[in-house]
């Protein structure tokens, strides 16, 4: 194999956020931008020599071109083996599972998650560690440090090969294995859930509408829900992955999944509605005419997880991101299990899962998952819901109503202020932090402030400290509001305000 060493220089703006590096697609297509970052992934993790990686993405615009570049660079950097989804398609949960199942050295996932795609949309590159989870800060910091000093990258002369056909080919000493993107993931789901009970429920007339939002989950949901479990044909809508997600915004919430909402609120609505996002790690749940908030979904799944075979024993614990409502805390207290509060970002759950401290995890941003992989998992959440409904017998609305009667209800909302000037956003947060010490005891709209702090997280496993993770204002009656800046946007700043 012949390869070239191309001279380059550091490019500004390559600091990974909570879920890798996300930018406008046009930025990733600029000369050396992708190549620099990929080389720094290899250099920042001890080099690629002799290593195996999982590679895939959500099918958005520039996915195949980026994978071709990664194949050539991995080969030039001495990688031993690449496992790639056919046509470059791999959901983030499936990539996490493959990383763990085949004991690879990590995964390179191409996605900007729920952000829009297309030539004028967003693109992203994320490195997952060998445990299948998002790289922790010590790794992303090392990658970022390399971006500040890079002088060259390596790339093979040879073309990347055809990833549209299942099989293997080689570039030099690097073997590229193209696999069916669904097979391994479906086998895992069959181990976790009572497929017989779910199939029987569908056979008895239960109906579902799953909106794949023209994103990566389409092939997975069609194969598993319609093919294996017997849901009626057409239950999965918008099932074909599209480079621009059908011109939509693949974010599973009532605004962007309005087609699903209209179906679930219409005449003759199905019994259950669900949607997933760009890379398949988020979920939206609906009953007839009713949206289930992600925070309530996490609480309900925790309360009824024992109905699924994989979670029939006592849960080790549950974890939620700090802005997520405390509904799940009430369930954990009754079950007698610990409830961990972490910063936003799935990577913070990784140590808890690896150490066996938590079984289920969730975020208010529509991500839920468990210890089966090290990522949140949209279709997993849907299947756990179906397992619960099949075994319990109540519908979604009744199950939630009974849950509120038993545990009480946490009223909750989130408000996003997007693409605001970064200086203005940081200035607002700095001003709020400066006032925190004087807030307790003051009145706001007739409510007394009881506490105010800037959330800091000391990881109970490795004692790493993450500071300035969001300002929390607590009131005497138990209400609270939270303000934080998000790390998943591609330009400007996103300010999120949470009310509970």
Predicted region positions:
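N-terminal small/polar loop signature for handling phosphorylated ligands or for N-terminal nucleophile
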Residues: 43, 54-121, 223-285
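Phosphate-binding and adjacent anionic-ligand microenvironments
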Residues: 270-272, 276, 285-288, 310-498
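Proline/glycine-rich low-complexity loops and linkers
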Residues: 87, 137-183, 287-364, 368-369
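Positively charged, low-complexity intrinsically disordered leader regions
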Residues: 1-36
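Glycine-rich phosphate/diphosphate-binding loops that line cofactor/substrate pockets in enzymes
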Residues: 38-53, 195-203
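Short glycine-rich or small-residue beta-strand-to-loop segments that form or flank ligand, phosphate
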Residues: 24, 52-58, 111, 126-128, ...
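Gly/Ser/Thr-enriched, mixed-charge loops and adjacent short helices
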Residues: 2-11, 32, 119-268
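Buried hydrophobic positions in well-ordered alpha/beta secondary-structure cores of metabolic enzymes
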Residues: 19, 55, 95, 108, ...
């Amino acid at each position: 194999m012949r390869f070239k060493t191309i001279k380059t220089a550091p490019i500004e703006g390559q600091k990974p956020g909570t879920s890798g590096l996300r930018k406008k697609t046009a930025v990733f297509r600029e000369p050396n931008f992708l190549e620099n970052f990929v080389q720094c992934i290899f250099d920042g993790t001890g080099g690629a020599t002799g290593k195996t990686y999982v590679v895939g993405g959500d099918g958005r615009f520039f996915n195949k071109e980026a994978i071709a570049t990664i194949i050539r660079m991995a080969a030039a950097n001495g990688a031993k083996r690449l496992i790639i989804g056919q046509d470059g398609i791999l959901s983030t949960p499936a990539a996490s599972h493959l990383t763990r199942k085949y004991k690879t050295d990590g995964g390179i996932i191409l996605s900007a998650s729920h952000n829009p795609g297309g030539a004028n949309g967003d693109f992203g590159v994320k490195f997952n560690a060998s445990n299948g989870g998002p790289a922790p800060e010590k790794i992303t910091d090392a990658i970022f440090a390399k971006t500040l000093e890079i002088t060259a990258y390596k790339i093979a002369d040879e073309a990347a090969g055809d990833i549209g056909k299942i099989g293997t080919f080689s570039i030099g000493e690097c073997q590229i294995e193209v696999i069916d993107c669904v097979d391994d993931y479906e086998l895992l789901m069959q181990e976790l859930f009572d497929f017989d009970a779910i199939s029987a429920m569908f056979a008895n007339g239960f109906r579902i509408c799953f909106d794949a939002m023209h994103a990566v989950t389409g092939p997975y949901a069609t194969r598993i829900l319609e093919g294996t479990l017997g849901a009626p044909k057409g239950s999965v809508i918008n099932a074909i992955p599209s480079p621009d997600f059908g011109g939509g915004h693949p974010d599973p919430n009532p605004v962007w999944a309005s087609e699903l909402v209209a179906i679930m609120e219409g005449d003759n609505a199905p019994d259950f509605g669900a949607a997933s996002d760009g890379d398949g790690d988020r979920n939206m749940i609906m009953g007839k005419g009713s949206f289930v908030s992600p925070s309530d979904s996490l609480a309900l799944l925790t309360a009824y997880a024992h109905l699924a075979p994989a979670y029939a024993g006592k849960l080790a614990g549950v974890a939620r991101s700090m802005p997520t409502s405390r509904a799940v805390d009430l369930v954990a207290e009754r079950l007698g299990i610990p409830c961990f509060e972490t910063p936003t970002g799935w990577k913070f759950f990784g140590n808890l899962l690896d150490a066996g401290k938590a079984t289920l995890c969730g975020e208010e941003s529509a991500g839920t998952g468990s210890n089966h992989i090290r990522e949140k998992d949209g279709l997993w959440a849907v299947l756990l819901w179906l397992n619960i409904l099949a075994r319990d017998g109540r519908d979604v609305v009744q199950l939630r109503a009974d849950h509120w009667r038993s545990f009480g209800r946490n009223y909750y909302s989130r408000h996003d202020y997007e693409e605001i000037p970064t200086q203005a956003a940081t200035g607002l947060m700095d001003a709020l932090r400066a006032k925190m010490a004087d807030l307790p005891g003051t009145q706001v709209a007739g409510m007394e402030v009881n506490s105010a702090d800037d959330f800091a997280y000391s990881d109970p496993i490795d004692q790493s400290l993450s500071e300035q993770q969001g300002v929390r204002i607590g009131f005497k009656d138990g209400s609270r509001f939270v303000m934080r800046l998000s790390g998943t946007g591609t330009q400007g700043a996103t300010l999120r305000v949470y009310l509970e």
